[in-house]
């Protein structure tokens, strides 16, 4: 049986999302197992946060106490233990955690994979198993193998989207046994801004009412209050595209309807994820808090859909 991100019967629209506790986070994703919530985000060994209610958060350590040895083969210049931009999915009884190994501003990168039977460290079966590399890029490639996101199409077939700058957002079909690229799978470019520096990254694809929605981040993160990150979205009837924005502009030609570009306090929102529970949905992302000198901070907000099926945030 396929599960995307199990949230049970939680009604996200009835919750108060005034988050509290340890909220430092960059590139967050969420999962829920039983009554407990988990956030995974960029940091030493992939950082983990946990919550009993989705609102009050505390740090819970990391996935990898030390980095897998194989990464040096792909990213020899990396000399610190920060792993980037995880994504997690639950498939056939196993949690699959994808993550990025790279150095800033280069496309010498690799996406790795770890698995676990449970997210609860109190469970005797709790153990993150290194499953090695998934896909990599080199300086001679026109894409950047970071920012992974796994999506299942309407037939239950898993796909991996990823990408940052270079030629933009990529998509490749996964093998259902290994959850790595299928033999002879074709690498597809599904979104590009069409001009240098092609500041698009962090894809996240969800399916709703017959449409695939591609959420991406435009412009520049990681500059604190000088960040220009913003969240954009397009949609397609086919997982491979073409994705178009609300005005019908192709995301292969710079299209993308802006969902959130921040405000005076919350600067540069981006690297988002979207989750459903019944008819309700949430948007999970980081933004830079101007009241805390640009500290990257976890945000979780209700995500609504208009009569034409386009997502929006409440004012």
Curated annotation (Swiss-Prot):
Primary localization class, coarse: cytoplasm
Gene Ontology molecular-function annotations: arabinan endo-1,5-alpha-L-arabinosidase activity; metal ion binding
Enzyme superclass (EC): hydrolase
EC number: 3.2.1.99
Cofactor annotation remark: Binds 1 Ca(2+) ion per subunit.
Cofactor: Ca(2+)
Keyword Endoplasmic reticulum: no
Recorded metabolic or biological pathway in which this protein acts: Glycan metabolism; L-arabinan degradation
One GO-annotated biological process of the protein: arabinan catabolic process
Site (Important for catalytic activity, responsible for pKa modulation of the active site Glu and correct orientation of both the proton donor and substrate): 147
InterPro entries per the UniProt record, alphabetical: GH43_arabinanases, Glyco_hydro_43, Glyco_hydro_43_endo_a_Ara-ase, Glyco_hydro_beta-prop_sf
UniProt binding sites for substrate: 27, 105, 144-147, 164-166
Keyword Hydrolase carried by entry: yes
Pfam families (UniProt xref): Glyco_hydro_43
Active site feature: 27, 201
Keyword entries, A-Z: Calcium, Carbohydrate metabolism, Cytoplasm, Glycosidase, Hydrolase, Metal-binding
Coiled-coil ranges per UniProt: none
UniProt xrefs under CDD domains: GH43_Arb43a-like
One cellular component term from this protein's GO annotations in UniProt: cytoplasm
Site (Important for substrate recognition): 271
Assembly information from the UniProt record: Monomer.
Family: Belongs to the glycosyl hydrolase 43 family.
Protein name listed in UniProt: Intracellular endo-alpha-(1->5)-L-arabinanase
The species this protein was found in: Geobacillus stearothermophilus (Bacillus stearothermophilus)
Lineage: Bacteria, Bacillati, Bacillota, Bacilli, Bacillales
Gene name of this polypeptide: abnB
């Amino acid at each position: 049986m396929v599960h995307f991100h199990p949230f049970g019967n939680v009604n996200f629209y009835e919750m108060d999302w005034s988050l509290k506790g340890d909220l430092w986070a960059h590139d967050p994703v969420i999962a829920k197992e039983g009554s407990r919530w988990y956030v995974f985000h960029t940091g030493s060994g992939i950082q983990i946060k946990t919550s009993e209610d989705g609102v009050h958060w505390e740090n819970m350590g990391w996935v990898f106490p030390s980095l897998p040895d194989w990464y040096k083969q792909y990213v020899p210049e990396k000399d610190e233990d920060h792993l980037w931009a995880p994504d997690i999915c639950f498939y056939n009884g196993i949690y699959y955690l994808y993550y990025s190994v790279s150095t800033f501003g280069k496309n010498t990168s690799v996406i790795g994979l770890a698995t676990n039977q449970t997210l609860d460290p109190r469970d005797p079966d709790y153990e993150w198993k290194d499953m090695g590399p998934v896909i990599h890029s080199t300086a001679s490639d026109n894409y950047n193998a970071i920012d992974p996101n796994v999506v299942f199409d309407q037939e239950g077939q898993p796909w991996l989207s990823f990408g940052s700058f270079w030629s933009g957002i990529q998509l490749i079909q996964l093998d259902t046994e290994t959850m790595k690229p299928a033999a002879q799978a074709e690498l597809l470019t599904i979104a590009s801004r069409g001009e240098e520096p092609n500041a698009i990254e962090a894809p996240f694809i969800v399916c709703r009412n017959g449409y695939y929605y591609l959420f991406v981040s435009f412009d520049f993160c990681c500059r604190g209050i000088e960040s220009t990150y913003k969240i954009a979205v397009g949609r397609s009837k086919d997982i491979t595209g073409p994705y178009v924005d609300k005005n019908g502009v192709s995301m292969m030609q710079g299209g993308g309807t802006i969902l959130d570009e921040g405000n005076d306090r919350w600067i540069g929102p981006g690297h988002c994820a979207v989750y459903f529970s019944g008819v309700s949905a949430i948007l999970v992302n980081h933004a830079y808090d101007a009241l805390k000198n640009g500290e990257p901070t976890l945000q979780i907000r209700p995500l609504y859909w208009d009569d034409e099926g386009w997502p929006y945030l409440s004012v």
